[in-house]
Amino acid sequence: NNDGTCIAIKRINLEHISPQLLKEEPLLQLNYHSATYIGYGPFALIPKTLVIDENYTTFLPLENNLRQRAKTIVNPLTNDILIAAYSNQWTIPNIKCRKYHEVELLATMALNSHTTNTMWAEITPQRINIIVIHDHKLQLANSYHISCDNDAAYYILACYQQLNLPQEEVELNIIGDLLTINPVPFLTDYIRHINTPQPQNWNAELPNQYAPLFTLQTKL
């Protein structure tokens, strides 16, 4: 609603928005003050020193139609470039949406956390997106295919090891679909500080287990 409180949740698993869904889904028939589309797709973190010209999309092995969808996010602290492209851009005829890439939002949230060193992980049923902040700067942005709790835990711990992050000190913030894949119980034996940040203005009347699904959306 107008104060940002979540008043309705509906989860629909699909590969594309069909004409039938557009006609039959009640939530898509309403008028909204604002709407947000969060997409996914290939992305890369590019050190500024490697960039010769402004054609950042050449760093992504994409077809031309996907390159045209690419969005560039420049880290204001280092001028390093995070470039992301949408795999698809669904449109809903009667709803005008602001479009964001999920990694863009995750990186922005991590950089705005005001924590010197931290890791952020977003879980989906098919992948885990990992952002690492070191000295308030974006050190890592990567995505890995996962299918179970152990996969997610493996990639998180591998990032700690490869980047020499002290597991007793560097906190892990984990959000996303923890109902489907949840490595937190396993990771508590290895990482001292694990947080599951809650969405802003979360409605106490809604089931709390759904909250991590919407942390990114409510940080916009």
Regions found by a protein language model. Give the residues of each.
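Hydrophobic/aromatic-enriched cytosolic interaction surfaces used to assemble or bind macromolecules
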Residues: 1-220
